[in-house]
A protein has these predicted regions:
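Alpha-helical transmembrane segments in inner-membrane proteins
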Residues: 1-346
Length: 346
C-alpha cells in the first residue's frame, strides 16, 4: 500500500514538473511572437513565419526581424535565465532566499569596473570587445563578492550581511558616479545608456559570446545538482556525502559571478530578477530539488525578462522604459511577499 502511495506521489510530481515546463514553453513561444509582432512597425504573424522559416519577405521587415527584434528577444531570454540562475546560486550559498546579485552589491561592483573600463578604452583606445566588458564585469563582481565573503566571516546574522551588501552597492555606485564626473560628454552618453539597463542594440555577435559564457556556466551548474542538493540539507550532511565544502562554495561564487557579470556587461544592471524568479520557480514546481529547479529557474527567468522587455517597449510607446524599471515593479512585490511571515511564523 505504501509502495502504491509512493508511486502515485512520484507520478503527481512528475506530472506537475512536466505541466509547468509545458506552460513555460507555450508562454515562451507566445511572448516571442508578440515581441516580434509589436513595435513601431507592426508585422503580421503570417509574415513573421514566412520570414523566420522560409526567409521570404520585404527587405525592411526581414531586417527588422533578423537584425533588431530577434537578437533582442534571444538576448533577453539568455540573460534573464543567467541572472535568475545567478540568484539561485547565491541563495544556495547564503542559505537565504533574499540573497541576489543586485541586493548584495555584486551587480554594482560589476557596473563600477565596467564603467571604468568603458571610459578608459573610449578615451585611449577607441573601442572595446564584448570579452573585455565581460572580463571587467567579472572582476567587479569578484571584488564585491570578496568583500561580502569577508563580512560573512565576521557577521553572524544574515540581515546584517544583506545590509552590508547594500552598502557595498552604494559605495560602488558612488565610485562610478565620481568617475563619470571626469569623463568626456560622449563617453557619459554611452555609459548612461548602458547603466540604465536595456536589451536594445543587441547583435548576433553579442549573442554568440553570451551563449558560450552562459551555456558553459549553466552546464556546470547542472552538473552540480547533487552537491547542491546535499548542501541544502546542511554543511555537515554535505561533508558526509563527500562534498568538499570550501571548494564547493568557491565554485558557487565563481559561477554566480560569471553569470551576473555577463548580464551586466551586455545589458547593464538589472534589479530583482535574481531574487524573485528562483522563488517563483520553487513555488511553481513545488520542490527545491536542484535537478528540477536549475533548468526551471533558467527557463522561467528567460520568460520573465522577455515579458518585462515587451512591457518596457510597449507600455509608453514610442518611449521605451528602462528594463530595471519594469523588473522592479514586477519583482519588488514578490520580494515583499517573500519577507512576510507565513502561518504565524515570526
Amino acid at each position: 500500500m505504501e509502495q502504491i502511495s509512493f508511486h502515485q506521489e512520484n507520478f503527481r510530481r512528475r506530472t506537475r514538473y512536466t505541466a509547468v515546463f509545458l506552460i513555460l514553453a507555450v508562454v515562451f513561444c507566445v511572448v516571442t511572437v508578440l515581441n516580434i509582432n509589436t513595435g513601431n512597425v507592426h508585422i503580421p504573424v503570417p509574415k513573421i513565419l514566412r520570414i523566420l522559416f522560409l526567409k521570404e519577405g520585404a527587405a525592411t521587415e526581414y531586417n527588422i526581424i533578423w537584425k533588431i527584434r530577434l537578437p533582442r528577444i534571444l538576448m533577453a531570454a539568455l540573460l534573464g535565465g543567467a541572472l535568475s540562475l545567478s540568484g539561485f546560486l547565491l541563495q544556495t550559498f547564503f542559505s537565504n532566499p533574499i540573497a541576489g546579485p543586485f541586493v548584495l552589491g555584486i551587480s554594482s561592483g560589476a557596473k563600477m569596473v565596467v564603467a571604468l573600463t568603458m571610459i578608459v578604452y573610449l578615451k585611449y583606445i577607441g573601442r572595446f570587445s564584448s570579452y573585455t566588458l565581460i572580463l571587467a564585469a567579472f572582476i567587479g563582481s569578484l571584488i564585491s563578492t570578496g568583500f561580502i565573503l569577508l563580512m560573512s566571516k565576521k557577521v553572524q546574522h544574515m540581515a546584517s550581511l544583506l545590509v552590508g551588501g547594500i552598502m557595498i552597492g552604494y559605495i560602488c555606485s558612488a565610485i562610478t558616479d565620481f568617475v563619470v564626473t571626469f569623463a568626456d560628454d560622449s563617453d557619459i552618453v554611452n555609459l548612461h545608456g548602458w547603466s540604465q539597463g536595456s536589451f536594445s542594440g543587441m547583435s548576433w555577435s553579442n549573442i554568440r559570446v553570451a551563449a558560450v559564457v552562459v551555456g558553459l556556466a549553466v552546464l556546470l551548474t547542472f552538473f552540480l545538482s547533487k552537491p547542491i542538493s546535499a548542501y541544502q540539507l546542511g554543511e555537515a550532511y554535505a561533508q558526509s556525502m563527500g562534498v568538499n565544502i570550501k571548494t564547493f562554495r568557491v565554485i558557487l561564487i565563481l559561477l554566480s559571478s560569471i553569470l551576473s557579470a555577463c548580464v551586466t556587461a551586455f545589458a547593464g544592471p538589472i534589479s530583482f530578477v535574481g531574487i524573485a524568479v528562483p522563488f517563483l520557480a520553487r513555488k511553481a514546481f513545488g520542490t527545491s530539488k536542484p535537478i528540477v529547479v536549475i533548468p526551471g529557474t533558467f527557463f522561467m527567468g528567460a520568460v520573465f525578462c522577455m515579458i518585462c522587455d515587451l512591457i518596457a517597449r510597449m507600455a509608453l510607446a514610442p518611449v521605451e522604459l528602462n528594463i530595471s524599471t519594469v523588473t522592479s515593479i514586477l519583482g519588488a512585490p514578490i520580494v515583499i511577499y517573500m519577507m512576510i511571515p507565513k502561518g504565524g511564523r515570526k
